[in-house]
Structures are given as structure tokens and as C-alpha cells.
């Protein structure tokens, strides 16, 4: 779509600072529902063009930008949400910053890419709820692990006669947290059952040896149920498991390696899946052993397994049928 105007929005907790690129006009509104309506009214009057010809751009700032994205979707506006790091690196060397300048820089970024961008598609409510539940579960699991580690170390530093209360309270906390984690798991199952498309992809992904429940759920929310990524290589790059060359002319001949710019949570989950697949999937075990026997580094081979697992995930989702181990048909 050809856009006639671009508006950059700097999102903060309390306010939205907006800048119209070609008119060089600035405004500030509250980060509330009334503020969103005021922003769209201002944009309509100030640009003088139809709203379907206007592209809005703002940074992805979590819950502060989510409500704005919901309002934009409801009003059928064209908008993109972009990571702040991408905008920052695209503008070259910059000095100084404030909300107005940030809005102008966001507008400049969007204007340069207005002909190549794909407007943002807000995930369905079920995916957003799974994301919130997984985040809560992660916090509860970390707390539980903290108490378990404390209990394990307690006997080394305190006499058993003096630690009765300390042990009792922490054991009760572990039991309470375990119950809350179970509640969260049941709620996730309820959300899955309410959305057939998500449940279908969840079952397909977990049919792959080595890919467990948490990884399958995280892949679904990261890919917007496989609508935001159409290729496993793009997701591999996003997860930080895609190898990139590191050479330049005759002076730099570095090793091919993965980028530190990555979704570290997804990368960690894929690493655990790769280790599990090597242990339990004969085909992956053979593939891993063959690479190491060729002299490949262990982590290099594990990374290759991570990429193969992502390829399998996209294959089963695209095909719409569970993974079938080929080794069981081998002669």
C-alpha cells in the first residue's frame, strides 16, 4: 500500500508524543483511551488525508504500547510496532534525546521504509493470555527454585535444631507455589482448548521428539501462531541460532558464528530441546555424532540440531500433520 503520510509516536507510561513527518507538526496526548481518540482526531485534521493512507509507527514497549495497538486495530488504522534497537541503529550517530525528538526520529524511520513495511497484526486474545500466563509461571518457578536452593544449602550453615522454623516456612512456600503453578497450567490448558487453531499447532509441534510443552507454547506466542514468520530460517535468525559469515576482504577471515542479537529465552529453550532430541531421537543422535566425528565443535553440532528442530516445526505446521520419524521406516 502507498502511504501519503507517516506519523511517529513515542510511547511512555503517561503520554504519547506524536510527530507528522511531512508537516513537521508535534502534539502530546495522554496514554489513555481518551488520549488515543484525541490523537486520531488530531491526525485526521492535521494531515488532511484519509486515515487509510496514513502509517503510524511506534516502538514495542510492552504493556505501555499494547493498549494503543488494540485501539489502532479496533479503528482499522495502519500501524507498525518496531523494536527500539532497530530504530536506534537505523538512524546512525545521534546526539541528545527527548520525547519530541524521539517521535521525530521514529517518523523518519517509518518514512524511509513506508513502501516496504508490512503493517502489524495484533495477536489474538488467546495468544496474549498465554503469553501473560507463561510469564507468571516463569516468575513462580523462579521463586520456587529459590526456596528449594535455600533449603538445600541450609543444613551446611545452620544446626538442625535451630532451623526448624526456617525449614518449615520455606517448605510451605514451595508447596503453595507448586499449587499456584498447577493453577496456571490448568488455565493455559483451558485457553488452548478454547482456540482450535492454537491447540492444533500445539499438538503438531509436540509430536516432534525433543520439543516439549514450554517450547511449543513459547513458539506459538513468538510467531503469533505462525502468522508472523513464514520461514524457519527467519525464526532461527530471530532466536540467535542462525550462523552468519564474519569476513571482509583479505584482512578479516573470522569464523561463521551466531549473532548475539537474539531472543535469549527462545534460544535457551531450543538448546534444551536439542540436547533432549540428541538423547531420545535416533536420527538426531546419528546426525550429531556424525558431525562431531567430522571434527565439528560440540556447540556447533548442537546449533545444527537446533536449526533442524525449527525446520521440523515449520514443516509439521505447514503440512498440518504430526511428525513421523523416518528411522522407523528404514530397512
Give the residues covered by each predicted segment.
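Short, solvent-exposed helix-loop connector elements
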Residues: 118-132, 159-162, 254-257, 286-303
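Phosphate-backbone recognition surface of nucleic-acid-processing proteins
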Residues: 207, 213, 217-298
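Low-complexity, acidic/Ser/Thr- and charged residue-rich accessory regions of DNA metabolism proteins
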Residues: 250-254, 288-331
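Short, glycine/acidic-enriched loop or turn micro-motifs at the edges of active sites
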Residues: 13, 62, 86
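Long, charge-rich intrinsically disordered scaffolds of nucleic-acid metabolism proteins
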Residues: 79-204
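Short glycine-rich phosphate-binding loop at a beta-alpha junction
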Residues: 52-64
Amino acid at each position: 500500500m502507498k502511504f501519503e503520510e507517516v506519523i511517529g509516536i513515542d510511547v511512555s507510561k503517561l503520554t504519547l508524543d506524536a510527530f507528522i513527518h511531512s508537516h513537521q507538526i508535534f502534539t502530546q496526548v495522554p496514554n489513555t483511551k481518551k488520549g488515543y481518540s484525541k490523537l486520531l482526531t488530531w491526525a485526521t485534521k492535521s494531515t488532511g488525508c484519509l486515515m487509510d493512507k496514513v502509517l503510524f509507527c511506534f516502538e514495542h514497549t510492552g504493556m505501555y504500547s499494547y493498549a494503543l495497538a488494540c485501539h489502532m486495530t479496533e479503528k482499522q488504522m495502519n500501524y507498525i510496532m518496531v523494536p527500539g534497537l532497530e530504530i536506534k541503529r537505523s538512524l546512525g550517530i545521534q546526539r541528545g534525546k527527548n520525547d519530541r525528538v524521539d517521535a521525530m526520529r521514529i517518523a523518519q524511520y517509518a518514512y524511509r521504509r513506508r513502501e516496504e513495511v508490512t503493517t502489524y497484526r495484533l495477536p489474538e486474545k488467546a495468544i496474549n493470555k498465554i503469553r501473560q500466563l507463561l510469564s507468571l509461571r516463569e516468575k513462580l518457578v523462579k521463586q520456587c527454585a529459590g526456596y528449594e536452593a535455600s533449603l538445600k544449602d541450609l543444613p551446611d550453615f545452620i544446626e538442625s535444631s535451630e532451623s526448624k522454623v526456617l525449614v518449615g516456612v520455606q517448605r510451605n512456600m514451595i508447596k503453595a507455589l507448586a499449587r499456584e503453578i498447577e493453577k496456571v497450567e490448568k488455565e493455559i490448558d483451558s485457553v488452548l482448548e478454547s482456540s482450535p487453531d492454537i491447540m492444533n499447532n500445539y499438538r503438531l509441534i509436540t509430536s516432534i521428539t525433543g520439543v516439549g510443552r514450554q517450547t511449543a507454547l513459547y513458539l506459538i506466542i513468538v510467531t503469533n501462531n505462525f502468522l508472523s514468520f513464514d520461514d524457519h530460517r527467519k525464526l532461527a535468525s530471530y532466536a540467535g541460532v542462525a550462523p552468519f559469515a564474519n569476513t571482509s576482504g583479505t584482512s578479516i577471515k573470522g569464523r561463521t558464528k551466531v549473532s548475539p542479537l537474539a531472543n535469549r529465552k527462545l534460544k535457551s529453550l531450543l538448546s534444551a530441546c536439542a540436547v533432549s532430541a540428541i538423547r531420545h531421537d535416533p536420527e538426531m543422535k546419528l546426525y550429531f555424532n556424525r558431525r562431531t566425528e567430522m571434527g565439528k565443535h560440540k556447540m556447533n553440532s548442537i546449533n545444527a540440531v537446533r536449526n533442524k528442530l525449527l525446520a521440523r516445526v515449520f514443516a509439521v505446521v505447514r503440512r498440518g500433520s504430526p511428525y513421523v520419524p523416518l528411522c522407523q521406516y528404514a530397512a
